[in-house]
Amino acid sequence: AGFAGDDAPRAVFPSIVGHPRHTGVMVGMGQKDAYVGDEAQSKRGILTLKYPIEHGIVSNWDDMEKIWHHTFYNELRVAHEEHPVLLTEAPLNPKANREKMTQIMFETFNVPAMYVAIQAVLSLYASGRTTGIVLDSGDGVSHTVPIYEGYALPHAILRLDLAGRDLTDNLMKILTERGYMFTTTAEREIVRDMKEELAYVALDYEQELDTAKSSSSVEKNYELPDGQVITIGAERFRCPEVLFQPSMIGMEAAGIHETTYNSIMKCDVDIRKDLYGNIVLSGGSTMFPGIADRMSKEITALAPSSMKIKVVAPPERKYSVWIGGSILASLSTFQQ
């Protein structure tokens, strides 16, 4: 969250709400009935953590309202009655959801004006383009969204319920093979950090596995909060490989490369060339080193041989949805 015209968000915190597991345990802490974001994260040992956004779509409005309240009051510290608000939504978000969002903004927060933009479209704007296909992969959901001259093509948008949370779960699972047990919601956050620090995408998965077996070149150490140091090797690239091979976690779905290709094939034949040449990665789950090269290699193998393929991975892509929103909301034409 932040202000239009800024080049980076002022507030970045996880969309989690924590409710105390036992009431009245924390003596003298002036116990709240709910904690949001980083505070929920740091007190996670005594809380039950919940994600009000599932697969990119809000499923728990009470908790979502708490997150918005926290954003206005504690993070941005602005009077919400005085500021127009730009919110974003997942592609193919149900209409009822958008209406509920609008209702809460006007009735609970009394905002003067609001607009709801599609996340992937904002990412494309942030990359300086108006035509291209965006692969947006966050924590709960991934989407491929073809956009032509500023407009998303809804018939060709594809959704993949595979994203950051599943990669963290996968890493938790494969760490147990090494005898490292991570199970609680608190421990999951440790594994998420490990994933963000150490995971990468292999250009050739099988070859990388052979390398990992025969040498220790891919091994890295990771220090846990209690000081214990663990070593991970092949787990580093096995974790995000699921994005390309969902069958590894028992999902019957096409990988992100094939989903992107399928999305392009649902578009008019005349615009495919523009899409192949402007494949833009966006979202936290596209931050793995090596992902753009792998994506390029896989799509080149699927596309017609003469086709020029370009995969763009902007360095700020973790926040490119926000940056696109900042650009859009600061245009004078938009404010009218």
Curated annotation (Swiss-Prot):
Gene Ontology cellular component terms for the protein in this record: actin cytoskeleton; cytosol
Record-annotated membrane-spanning stretches: none
Keyword ATP-binding on entry: yes
GO biological process: cell division
Catalytic activity: ATP + H2O = ADP + phosphate + H(+)
Keywords attached to this entry: ATP-binding, Cytoplasm, Cytoskeleton, Hydrolase, Nucleotide-binding
EC numbers, comma separated: 3.6.4.-
Localization: Cytoplasm, Cytoskeleton
Pfam families the UniProt entry points to: Actin
Major subcellular site: cytoplasm
Family designation: Belongs to the actin family.
Note: There are at least 7 different actin genes in tobacco.
Protein name: Actin-103
Originating organism: Nicotiana tabacum (Common tobacco)
